[in-house]
């Protein structure tokens, strides 16, 4: 399962490297962008959290949003991604999920590649 996850994340990174303009900002004017896989994974993660505890889904999304909005101030605290052998790809851990993101130093942006349920894939 982890190889399948790595492959999908790598495909999203490759898409970004080929066509940066195809990625949307997390919020207008932000230097955080998200991939299609991230959007799909967010919907699946929210559904999973809701199936476990319907009241927690709002807290999950709000806390994740807060982390992402403030991630630029804490980039150095995040560890190298377990899915890539690259110092420019790190993982944010949130409530049993990993959010791998790419640091595009040349453009000064961060790209959210996906959301992985750590308990299922590891």
Predicted region positions:
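A broad, structure-centric signal for solvent-exposed, well-ordered loop/edge residues
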Residues: 37, 41, 56, 78, ...
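Sparse, context-dependent recognition of short Cys/His-centered cofactor- or disulfide-binding micro-motifs
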Residues: 33, 45, 56, 74-86, ...
């Amino acid at each position: 399962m982890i190889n399948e996850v790595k492959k999908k994340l790598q495909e999203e990174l490759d898409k970004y490297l080929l066509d940066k303009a195809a990625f949307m900002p997390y919020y207008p004017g932000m230097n955080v962008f998200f991939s299609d896989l991230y959007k799909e994974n967010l919907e699946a993660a929210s559904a999973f959290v809701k199936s476990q505890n319907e009241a927690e889904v709002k807290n999950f999304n709000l806390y994740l949003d807060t982390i992402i909005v403030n991630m630029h101030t804490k980039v150095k605290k995040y560890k190298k991604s377990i899915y890539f052998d690259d110092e420019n790809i790190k993982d944010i851990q949130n409530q049993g999920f990993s959010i791998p993101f790419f640091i595009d130093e040349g453009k000064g942006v961060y790209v959210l590649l996906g959301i992985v349920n750590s308990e299922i894939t590891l």
